[in-house]
Amino acid sequence: MHKIYIFISYFLIPFIYLNTFIRLIKKKEDSNRYKERFGFTNLKKNVQKEVVWIHASSVGEFKSCDLLINHFYKTYNLLITTTTKTAADYALENYGEKIIHQYAPYDVVPWIDKFLDIWKPKLAIWIE
């Protein structure tokens, strides 16, 4: 089953690029940050601290992260990923310097591998 999933994800790559391009044209994607969806980043982490990664897709999920953010941000690089522009805006407006925000990469093996190679999180937490 896992091999089928990987095959399908590779097969969908051209369509994912096309969808991202359409979203850019419609202004539904941040033109300065869309490459984050493919695992790239220009963001910097404090190399003295390990990374804790919290993923919250939407604003509603992100709002439930307050205790986690306040618990981890002083000790760790706190990487927050979201999938929507609204959640990204909310995260940066409300937590700014406490967090590092990046859009979550699309669920395609090479893009996730690139993301994980860059950030090397010690802990990953998904909010559902």
Predicted regions, residues:
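Active-site and donor-binding regions of nucleotide-sugar-utilizing enzymes
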Residues: 17-39, 43-128
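Short hydrophobic helices that act as membrane-entry/anchoring signals
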Residues: 2-24
